């Protein structure tokens, strides 16, 4: 018989940098999970990813205090900022443009996000990423 699920915990943790301090410690401590076991497993799984990149993770906690977790791809906004070489998006995206990004870079980001996005095809995903870029104050160049 399958294990009984006690809770789902959603967090964003820096790749390769999970430690028992907030937000990881309190979120998992409330569920009675072995925090260090999660930190070691997460850091081992994300060691191939650029260190410090925020990685969304969904942790399934079972009634016997065991857990499994699924890592997702970094948020589109983080990938866009990295590709454009900017620190943050624009406070007024329609007036103040903070950088430029090419359509090829958008397609590359869409390919990266393809595993997590539910878009019908790569073109639809690219358009979705393009909308995120525009809302951040980035100019999309052909």
From Swiss-Prot:
It holds the Pfam family Ribosomal_L11_N. Keywords: Methylation, Ribonucleoprotein, Ribosomal protein, RNA-binding, rRNA-binding. One of its GO terms (molecular function) is structural constituent of ribosome. GO terms for biological process: translation. One of its GO terms (cellular component) is cytosolic large ribosomal subunit. PROSITE patterns: RIBOSOMAL_L11. One or more lysine residues are methylated. The keyword Protease does not apply. The keyword Ribonucleoprotein applies. Coiled coil: none annotated. Belongs to the universal ribosomal protein uL11 family. NCBIfam families: L11_bact (TIGR01632). Forms part of the ribosomal stalk which helps the ribosome interact with GTP-bound translation factors. PANTHER family: 60S RIBOSOMAL PROTEIN L12, LARGE RIBOSOMAL SUBUNIT PROTEIN UL11M. Part of the ribosomal stalk of the 50S ribosomal subunit. Interacts with L10 and the large rRNA to form the base of the stalk. L10 forms an elongated spine to which L12 dimers bind in a sequential fashion forming a multimeric L10(L12)X complex. This is Large ribosomal subunit protein uL11. The lineage of its organism: Bacteria, Pseudomonadati, Pseudomonadota, Gammaproteobacteria, Enterobacterales. The gene is rplK.
